[in-house]
Amino acid sequence: MDLAALRTQQQQLAASVERADRLDRDPPALIGGADVGFEQEGEVTRAAMVLLTWPELELVEYQVARVATTMPYIPGFLSFRETPALLAAWEQLSQKPDLLFVDGHGISHPRRLGVASHFGLMIDVPTIGVAKKRLCGKIGELGDEPGALAPLMDKNEQLAWVWRSKVRCNPLFISTGHRVGMDSALMWVERCMRGYRLPEPTRWADAVASRRPSFVRWQANHG
């Protein structure tokens, strides 16, 4: 595997990421959520995609796609491993969201191309990265209280907002994916909170992917 070529490709793609707001529909009618996991000891990549209405944040559609994993796990190159399954799930949706939350990083990546940015470029849809762990950069001083906020910085460049969404929970790393500004990304994540650590779009995507009780109950109520 030619990592140098992939690194160059990342740098070229990162230059095309739009870091300012460009939503085709504002406010959005549908907000999507995406989550990727792996099955069969990594041999299969599974992507879950959900659609929620705005502003109700009610789940109206979900799709799960499974594809053969074509690339090993290599730190910093995860988007090449995850985007084939994301694209398969995206293509199964009967409608497309106006804004998509992706479980993972956007520009808060060593080469400014996490999966939220990479996939956003592929489908040319506004995306927001919602990650649970830091990949690069330094966190400013962050309080312990819910709502505490600090920038994630690298070489005098802000890569993300580090935001503690709930008491006694690790913070989220919220970043521009594509066609959404940094402050707007934070605003939309805040607006999509309903008392959990994660915003509803990625919380539901995770629930669908892992068949959590909340999703099982939803299925029972919706046939």
Swiss-Prot record:
EC number: 3.1.21.7
InterPro entries from the UniProt entry: Endonuclease-V (IPR007581)
GO-annotated molecular function: deoxyribonuclease V activity; magnesium ion binding; RNA endonuclease activity, producing 5'-phosphomonoesters; single-stranded RNA binding
Principal cellular location given in the protein's record: cytoplasm
Domain of life: Bacteria
Compartments reported by the entry: Cytoplasm
A Pfam family this chain is assigned to: Endonuclease_5
Enzyme class: hydrolase
Binding site for Mg(2+): 35, 103
Reactions it catalyzes: Endonucleolytic cleavage at apurinic or apyrimidinic sites to products with a 5'-phosphate
GO biological process terms held by the UniProt record: DNA repair
Site keyed Interaction with target DNA: positions: 73
Cellular component annotations (GO), alphabetically ordered: cytoplasm
Keywords, sorted A to Z: Cytoplasm, DNA damage, DNA repair, Endonuclease, Hydrolase, Magnesium, Metal-binding, Nuclease
Cofactor: Mg(2+)
Main function: DNA repair enzyme involved in the repair of deaminated bases. Selectively cleaves double-stranded DNA at the second phosphodiester bond 3' to a deoxyinosine leaving behind the intact lesion on the nicked DNA.
Family, similarity comment: Belongs to the endonuclease V family.
Protein name: Endonuclease V
The species this protein was found in: Klebsiella pneumoniae (strain 342)
Species classification: Bacteria, Pseudomonadati, Pseudomonadota, Gammaproteobacteria, Enterobacterales
Name of the encoding gene: nfi
